């Protein structure tokens, strides 16, 4: 027999018949239907909604609404302004390694990002992970180029 979509059946015992509660004592789930004698959990309209704490102000309403969320994996950069690049001689290539060697950056823990504060007079080829729009405009206005590293 080939396996066809219309011939599929669930495994034996995989689908149980729905238990009909409250249909007489002999049915096994009659009278109180397994809900106990009294109390909120035995009443009609049960169960209570998730987060319900018996009438007291629930936790999700007690805590303040937060206006923002923190990123799980935030990107961190070693930032450097365009004005700091004036110390480097014109025509050279600037990257994180050369900045550490020149002593401009002291602790290179993360990729380099160039910010646009200040003015740039020298023509440089700058290699960095990210540039702000103003930094890119100032480097290119001075005759230099921006190379984005991955």
UniProtKB/Swiss-Prot annotation:
Residues 1-57 are annotated as: Disordered. It comes from the Bacteria. One of its GO terms (cellular component) is cytosolic large ribosomal subunit. One of its GO terms (molecular function) is structural constituent of ribosome. Pfam families: Ribosomal_L27A (PF00828). Keywords: Ribonucleoprotein, Ribosomal protein, RNA-binding, rRNA-binding. Residues 12-23 have a biased composition (Basic residues). One of its GO terms (biological process) is translation. Residues 25-37 have a biased composition (Gly residues). Belongs to the universal ribosomal protein uL15 family. Part of the 50S ribosomal subunit. Binds to the 23S rRNA. This is Large ribosomal subunit protein uL15. It comes from Synechococcus sp. (strain CC9311).
